[in-house]
Each structure stands twice: as structure tokens, then as C-alpha cells.
UniProtKB/Swiss-Prot annotation:
Gene3D superfamilies: 3-hydroxy-3-methylglutaryl-coenzyme A Reductase, Chain A, domain 2, HMGR, N-terminal domain, Hydroxymethylglutaryl-CoA reductase, class I/II, NAD/NADP-binding domain. Pathway: Metabolic intermediate biosynthesis; (R)-mevalonate biosynthesis; (R)-mevalonate from acetyl-CoA: step 3/3. Residues 1-37, 103-549 are lumenal. Induction: Repressed by darkness in roots and leaves, but increased ginsenosides accumulation. Repressed transiently by mevinolin (Mev). Belongs to the HMG-CoA reductase family. The chain crosses the membrane at residues 38-58, 82-102, 550-570. It is a multi-pass membrane protein. GO terms for molecular function: hydroxymethylglutaryl-CoA reductase (NADPH) activity. Residues 59-81, 571-594 are cytoplasmic. The gene is HMGR2. This is 3-hydroxy-3-methylglutaryl coenzyme A reductase 2-A. It catalyses: (R)-mevalonate + 2 NADP(+) + CoA = (3S)-3-hydroxy-3-methylglutaryl-CoA + 2 NADPH + 2 H(+). PROSITE patterns: HMG_COA_REDUCTASE_1, HMG_COA_REDUCTASE_2, HMG_COA_REDUCTASE_3, HMG_COA_REDUCTASE_4. It comes from Panax ginseng (Korean ginseng).
Length: 594
């Protein structure tokens, strides 16, 4: 008799299965009898017979001991064997009845990120039944073809897994030829500079391989875990990185869909922090179920501020008055605008410190982040000013009044790059069922933590929970400059109860988001793919600058989702629990080699 409990296939679960993940009905757990080669009916019959026979034998023996006044703890060899068989049969039967019964009647408790499945209103909101979503094929895609595969030698040939192919990391490097060996030795001894390998060899991949081998010999440290193959080193030559020896792999997760300005976006996030993508995804779910978020672009202008020095304070002040006079604005603007098709001067602001003058130029830069563009225009203006102010000494093209890659009040107040505000109204039932908290608790915690707490800490632009987490993850995945996360993460998060205290209004104001969709790391294959996913790849031909502005709005919307979810976890006391579940390494660090 077949006593297995067969899982019932559910149509609803099959429909909602995500791509690449089998539905729950198809996820079968191994049974106890799967390890035995006998047919199922024979295995069941064997263990049923064993259980009742051994039980009868033991009860009969114990009855005789009681009659003969023999201690029960004194067992013979046959009784010991019977006990072992009894335990084996009990374990087998529990594998069918006990565990299966528990799985069928006990439902796992919902974790911090799950919405209640029996809530029809939330399920309808979360079903994403929009025109663009209905066209999506939710069936399981075919398994991708795996290249670079080698047989696993350590497997048992008789095992069912012996014929499987497993992917091997690109760690093994082809042996060096005699010519390459000589080059490596020359690099090690210093006869050939490491930085000149690309120009001497004319092969960027070969140069990276030789530099890598030379580095290992010089330091005596292995780079076996750092991949070398599978990267286009020519694409970074003279643009992204010098003297490469490999590349670092960072996993990319997807949060969303983020419903922003009535459009859905799947947000790529490159991170090694567990729970970050899951938390942001929960925020996106809450925003989606509440009707979406709205963003507004307030400003769009990159800055560069050179520092110049004069012999007297008076001369420094004269240049300040000249540049800030509206009647004189057209002259430097004309000189500045000649440097680029897209760079357009928007304004000049000066600050005097003794004999030194700091000149802050602001300009539009199209779809580029624009730091190089504005620097080129500034240099042209400085060269022009030398004719009227020959005693002006240019001390540096950047005097930190910009201010780039540093927390600064000038960016927090005046803005730099894109200044964006994003808001959403989260419904009461969504706050309770998706975010597992309530509106009053969120409003109070936001005031105590993000506003008062940040003020107590003397924060500068840090009136938020973790904006930099989301900004950094999106920046890395889309090829932005990660160092500009410093000023780009300036954010103030506001929350208040609306609609008679039932719903939550949340907003993030970010005055200095510095992003671009052309130049720098955006042209790399992986980063370009992420930009394409968002629909902002490259420069916009119809409206120059619109792609970078949209990317800034998506960053702000993602920060809104991340802030909403983390604050909810804090208000509900779920932060530690979720991080223990999603942000814990399973590796024994004591066994890792240094």
C-alpha cells in the first residue's frame, strides 16, 4: 500500500511562480524510502511487518520478565536487536506520517517581508495587472545553456550525478609561453614598467595576465580567487581603470516593480549586504499597492569651483563683483558654452577667503554626469579672465567649493547634479499588512530617529535611515561613480499622517544626485545592461538630458522604498530578526585562509 502523501498541484501557485523558480507544488522533498532500491509497496510492507513483529516480541518478553520478577533493564542480545529494529521502523514511519502530517497542517509563520496571502485587496493591488504586465510570460524559461563546463572529477562514477557538468570559476590560467615568461621576469625585475604593458604588447587581455603573474611573484600572494577571463579589458583602457589584473564580481538583485510616475521600473541593485534588496523590494510592493509614487525634478546642474589667488583682498573682491554682475554674465557664458555641445552655463557664485576667491560654476551637462565637461568649460573661462586679471593666479581647477565627493553644506543647500523630491501616500491597510506596523508608530519613529536623532548627531544631509545603501547599490549596478555616493546620499525623509490619520505620507528630498547615462562606467557591458533594463541607456536623442534626469528620479524612488521598509522594520522590531535570517554568512571564518 502506498502511504506517501502526494502533494496536490495548485493552479494558483503554478500561475504565480516566478521565472526560474519552480512552484511549490513541484518542490518535492526526498522521502525516507528514496534511498532504498526496493519498490515502494515492498518497503512499506517490510517496515510495517517489522514494527508490529518487534513490538509483539518485546511486549511478550517484558510480560515474562514481570511474571518472573526479572529487572526490565536487563536485556538480552535478541532484545537489544529488537529495540534497534523498533527504532528503525519508527523513524521510517514518522518520515511518512509525522513529518508529512506536520507539513500539511502547520503553515510557516510569515516573515518580515511577506504580505498576508488571504487578503484579497492587497493581492489585487500586488497582482500587477497592468497592460505591460499582462504581456509578460510567467512560464518557466528554458534552462540557459552553460558554456565553460568541465566534468567534476571527484564524483563517484556510479552516482547519478557523475554525468552532470558543473561550472568552474575562471581561476585556471593558461601556461605562459617562453616569450611571456621573459616579459614577466622583466616586469618583476623592473626592466619593463607594469603600466606600459598595454602599449608594448598591444593586447589588453595579455597585458593584464602578465601583470597579474608578475604581481603574484613579487608579493608571494595568490590571486586565484580573482577572475581574469570573461572581461573586455580593451573597453576600460584609458577610461575606467589602469593596470588591471582582474575584476571583482558583485551580485546584482532586482527590486520592484517600482511604480513611479505611473511607470513600472525593475531596479538593479549591486550589493553584498544581505536583506537590502529584499527590504527595498518590500518598499516597492507597498508603494505599488498604494497607487505608486510621484517625483519632481527641482534642479539639474553640475558644479565646479576653482580657487584663484590675488595679491590683495581688493582684487579678489573686484573679480567677484565682475562675475556676479548680471550685466556681465553673457561674456563668461559665451566662452563656457563653446567648450561643449551640451554644456550650458547656468550660474556663477563666488566666495572670498582672504586673498583667495572660490568661483562656483553651475552648468547643464546633458545625459553625462558632466564633471569633465564642466571642468573643460571652467578652464576656458579662466583662460579668458587672465586677459583682464593678469595678476590672477589659478591655484587649482577645484577648490572644494564644488564640492565633489565630500559632505558639504553647499551641496545640501544649493544642490549639485540633480535635485529630486519623491513622495507617496501609503494606505493604512498596506502599512498594517505589508509593512507590519502602523502609521502613528512610523511618524513618531521618523521624528525621533531621522530628524531629532540626526540633529543630535550633528548630521549634514543625513536626515534619513539608510539612503546611501540604496544609492550605492544602484550606482554600482549602473556604472556611476561610487565615490559620489557621499553627496548623492544627502537626503531628508519626512513622514506624516494624512486622511484623518489613517494613511501615511512619506517623502524624500535629495538635492545632489550626481548621475549620468553616458561616459565612465556606463559603457561597460554589465552596467549598460542595467541601464537598458531601466530604459535609460545612452544619450537621449529626442531630449538631451532626459535619460539622466529619469535615472535620478528612479534613484530617489528607490530610496523612498528603502526608507519606507527599513523604518517599518524598526518600528515593528523586525530589523535584528530579518538580518539574522538574510545577512548571516554560513561559512566558518576560522577555517578561511588569510
Amino acid at each position: 500500500m502506498d502511504v506517501r502523501r502526494r502533494p496536490v498541484k495548485s493552479l494558483s501557485s503554478a500561475k504565480t511562480a516566478t521565472a526560474g523558480e519552480p512552484p511549490k507544488s513541484q518542490q518535492q522533498h526526498p522521502k525516507a524510502s528514496d534511498a532504498l532500491p526496493l519498490p515502494l509497496y515492498l518497503t512499506n510492507g517490510l517496515f510495517f511487518t517489522m514494527f508490529f513483529s518487534v513490538m509483539y516480541f518485546l511486549l511478550h518478553r517484558w510480560r515474562e520478565k514481570i511474571r518472573n520478577s526479572t529487572p526490565l533493564h536487563v536485556v538480552t542480545l535478541s532484545e537489544l536487536a529488537a529495540l534497534v529494529l523498533l527504532m528503525a521502523s519508527v523513524i521510517y514511519l514518522l518520515g511518512f506520517f509525522g513529518i508529512g502530517f506536520v507539513r500539511s497542517v502547520i503553515r510557516p509563520s510569515p516573515d518580515a517581508w511577506d504580505i498576508l496571502e488571504d487578503d484579497n485587496a492587497i493581492n489585487e493591488e500586488d497582482s500587477r495587472r497592468e497592460p505591460c504586465a499582462e504581456a509578460i510570460d510567467c512560464s518557466l524559461p528554458p534552462k540557459p545553456k552553460i558554456v565553460h563546463m568541465v566534468p567534476q572529477k571527484a564524483l563517484n562514477p556510479k552516482s547519478a550525478f557523475a554525468d552532470m557538468m558543473v561550472e568552474q570559476p575562471a581561476l585556471a590560467i593558461a601556461p605562459l609561453t617562453e616569450e611571456d615568461e621573459e616579459i614577466v621576469k622583466s616586469v618583476v625585475t623592473g626592466k619593463i614598467p607594469s603600466y606600459s604593458l598595454e602599449s608594448k604588447l598591444g593586447d589588453c587581455k595579455k597585458a593584464a595576465s602578465i601583470r597579474r603573474e608578475a604581481l603574484q611573484r613579487i608579493t608571494g600572494k595568490s590571486l586565484a580567487g580573482l577572475p581574469l577571463d570573461g572581461f573586455d579589458y580593451k573597453s576600460i583602457l584609458g577610461q575606467c581603470c589602469e593596470m588591471p589584473v582582474g575584476y571583482v564580481q558583485i551580485p546584482v538583485g532586482i527590486a520592484g516593480p517600482l511604480l513611479l510616475n505611473e511607470t513600472e521600473y525593475s531596479v538593479p541593485m549591486a550589493t553584498t549586504e544581505g536583506c537590502l534588496v529584499a527590504s527595498t523590494n518590500r518598499g516597492c510592493k507597498a508603494i505599488y499597492a498604494s497607487g505608486g509614487a510621484t517625483s519632481v525634478l527641482l534642479r539639474d546642474g553640475m558644479t565646479r569651483a576653482p580657487v584663484v589667488r590675488f595679491s590683495t583682498v581688493k582684487r579678489a573682491a573686484e573679480l567677484k563683483f565682475f562675475l556676479e554682475e548680471p550685466l556681465n554674465y553673457d561674456t563668461p557664458a559665451h566662452v563656457f558654452n563653446k567648450s561643449s555641445r551640451f554644456g550650458r552655463l547656468q550660474g556663477i557664485k563666488c566666495a572670498v577667503a582672504g586673498k583667495n576667491l572660490y568661483i562656483r560654476f553651475t552648468c547643464s551637462t546633458g545625459d553625462a554626469m558632466g564633471m569633465n565637461m564642466v571642468s573643460k568649460g571652467v578652464q576656458n573661462v579662466l583662460d579668458f579672465l587672465q586677459s583682464d586679471f593678469p595678476d590672477m593666479d589659478v591655484m587649482g581647477i577645484s577648490g572644494n567649493y564644488c564640492s565633489d565627493k565630500k559632505p558639504a553644506a553647499v551641496n545640501w543647500i544649493e544642490g549639485c547634479g540633480k535635485s529630486v523630491v519623491c513622495e507617496a501616500i501609503i494606505k493604512e491597510e498596506v502599512v498594517k499588512k505589508v509593512l507590519k506596523t502602523n502609521v502613528a508608530a512610523l511618524v513618531e519613529l521618523n521624528m525621533l530617529k531621522n530628524l531629532a536623532g540626526s540633529a543630535v548627531a550633528g548630521a549634514l544631509g543625513g536626515f534619513n535611515a539608510h539612503a546611501s545603501n540604496i544609492v550605492s547599490a544602484v550606482y554600482i549596478s549602473t556604472g556611476q561613480d561610487p565615490a559620489q555616493n557621499v553627496e548623492s546620499s544627502h537626503c531628508i525623509t519626512m513622514m506624516e499622517a494624512v486622511n484623518n490619520g489613517k494613511d501615511l505620507h512619506i517623502s524624500v528630498t535629495m538635492p545632489s544626485i550626481e548621475v549620468g547615462t553616458v561616459g565612465g562606467g556606463t559603457q561597460l557591458a554589465s552596467q549598460s545592461a542595467c541601464l537598458n533594463l531601466l530604459g535609460v541607456k545612452g544619450a537621449s536623442k529626442e531630449s538631451p538630458g532626459s535619460n539622466s534626469r529619469l535615472l535620478a528620479s528612479i534613484v530617489a524612488g528607490s530610496v523612498l522604498a528603502g526608507e519606507l521598509s527599513l523604518m517599518s522594520a524598526l518600528a515593528a522590531g523586525q530589523l535584528v530578526k530579518s538580518h539574522m535570517k538574510y545577512n548571516r554568512s554560513s561559512k566558518d571564518i576560522t577555517k578561511l585562509s588569510s
